[in-house]
């Protein structure tokens, strides 16, 4: 694990974005951990979050021209990632996001920010069912752009209804690469290294054994 990944896990724990316990997911599964990126909700939180997204993006070394943040959660993520890339990597990257409702007055349309053209890096918090990604793909295609990759905070590495995870399905269906700041495997490595969270480690491993992707 890279230093920024360890720091991100500790940041998520500190802000209670990452919690351990018993949580019922939309899928109906009972998960021993829960990740709620909406709790990164102050200016300082967002500034730090952007640095982690930017670090993961630099680490992945994927070519892209524009950051796209799907409404609504992707909007602040795209914004703070663009700021972090400028501040810490001297990269002035255009960013764009969509409105849920088309505007009839002013500049009109559903897109705000830069033009959506060239190679697009889509940024979001997590991929649960892949629905938001599929909606974003329609917007990207409508604008004649190409999806270069998808960047999220956490990859749960968890099967969907079939054997593949939602992320693996997105990679297959859109012939793209999904990168994440951390994966479930990183979280398990972190718990193992701490030695003080053995009860959480056991339940997370059991959950992975039952629902994890191969």
Swiss-Prot record:
Molecular function terms, GO-annotated: magnesium ion binding; orotate phosphoribosyltransferase activity
Enzyme Commission no: 2.4.2.10
Catalytic activity: orotidine 5'-phosphate + diphosphate = orotate + 5-phospho-alpha-D-ribose 1-diphosphate
Biological or metabolic pathway of the protein: Pyrimidine metabolism; UMP biosynthesis via de novo pathway; UMP from orotate: step 1/2
Positions bound to 5-phospho-alpha-D-ribose 1-diphosphate: 26, 72-73, 99-100, 103, 105, 124-132
Cofactor: Mg(2+)
Enzyme class of the recorded protein, top EC level: transferase
Any single GO BP term: 'de novo' UMP biosynthetic process
InterPro entries: OPRT, Or_phspho_trans_dom, PRibTrfase_dom, PRTase-like
Role: Catalyzes the transfer of a ribosyl phosphate group from 5-phosphoribose 1-diphosphate to orotate, leading to the formation of orotidine monophosphate (OMP).
Stored NCBIfam families: pyrE (TIGR00336)
Oligomeric and partner information: Homodimer.
Stated family: Belongs to the purine/pyrimidine phosphoribosyltransferase family. PyrE subfamily.
Protein name: Orotate phosphoribosyltransferase
Species assigned in the record: Pseudoalteromonas translucida (strain TAC 125)
């Amino acid at each position: 694990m890279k230093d920024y990944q360890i720091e991100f896990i500790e940041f998520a724990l500190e802000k209670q974005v990452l919690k351990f316990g018993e949580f019922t997911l939309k899928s109906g599964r009972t998960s021993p951990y829960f990740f709620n990126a909406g709790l990164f909700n102050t200016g300082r939180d967002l500034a730090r979050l952007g640095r982690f997204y930017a670090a993961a993006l630099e680490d992945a070394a994927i070519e892209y021209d524009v950051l796209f943040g799907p409404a609504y959660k992707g909007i602040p993520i795209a914004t703070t990632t663009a700021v972090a890339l400028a501040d810490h990597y001297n990269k002035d990257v255009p960013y764009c996001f969509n409105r849920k409702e088309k505007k009839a007055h002013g500049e009109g349309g559903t897109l705000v920010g830069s033009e959506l053209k060239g190679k697009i890096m889509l940024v979001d918090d997590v991929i649960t069912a892949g629905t938001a990604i599929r909606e974003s793909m329609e917007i990207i295609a409508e604008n004649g752009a190409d999806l270069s990759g998808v960047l999220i905070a956490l990859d749960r590495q968890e099967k969907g209804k079939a054997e593949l995870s939602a992320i693996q399905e997105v990679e297959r269906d859109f012939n793209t690469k999904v990168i994440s700041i951390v994966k479930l495997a990183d979280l398990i490595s972190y718990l193992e290294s701490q030695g003080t969270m053995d009860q959480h480690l056991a339940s997370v491993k059991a959950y992975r054994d039952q629902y994890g992707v191969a």
